Amino acid sequence: MKKAVAFFAVMLIVLSVFSQNLFSFANNVSPHESKEKEYPEVLERFSVFKASKVEKRIREAEEARKRELERLLSEEKKRKRIEQTLSNIKNGKTSLRKVFANTCFVGDSLINGLETYNILNSDKIISQVSARFSHLEDNIKKIISLNPKVLILHYGINMLWFDDTGLGWFIDDYSELVKKLKKQLPHTRIIVSGIFPVNEEVATDGIFIRVPDHNLAIEKMCKEIGVEFLDSTELVLGCKEYYGSDGIHFSASFYSEKWLPFIVENKGIIG
């Protein structure tokens, strides 16, 4: 029994000395110093990783800033060219024929006016009085063969009479033809014009109240397909004096003084 007590006492003394030494060591060495001494390579790699990550973010920010600056400069340059083109048209220094030399206009009698009044080159105008989508379908091969830089379509007003059942068939047919053109002309800018509103005196006819809904549907179609939409509504409503006697078609000056410069300004077509 005495031996056991003596052994137990010795063990307590040993444990006490060990604990004091351990506590002293812990006080003299911080946790960070301990970790640094134990894992120097890991800490070094982590520091390099953090530095490279920061450098990467700085490079990305600089590249993004550079791209944004280039975009702004490009837009400013384009805006000045558009302004210069509009000024040259107004002053007679350049012709509409030259500006739209690489643009093909396709559509109904409202497009036909460009040829009737001899405003643009007839070889880039494909139009027909009272044209419907069948006209566009019949001329797809011809349009593709021209391979224009820009293609502007205007259809719809002649289908208002036959649209009692809603917009479904109208958009389905139009969409199918535009998709076909986009596939066959991958490098051509395709611009779909909304239907021109009619003179307010004619607008009382029931069929013409459908124009705004049709234009909204055409605009939505353009977004879904990935082509451009041209909304001339505000322009036309401000040009009442340019309507013909029927309140639907326009005078020559509407095209030369209003609509074509409007396209230059809003779509950046400068030749």
At which residue positions do the language-model features occur?
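A short helix->loop->beta-strand "cap" motif at the edges of active sites that frequently abuts
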Residues: 185-189
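Second-shell loop/turn segments in exported
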Residues: 127-129, 159-168, 181, 203-208, ...
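N-terminal secretory targeting modules
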Residues: 1-100, 116, 270-271
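Catalytic His-Asp segment of secreted/periplasmic serine-dependent ester chemistry enzymes
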Residues: 18, 22, 198-271
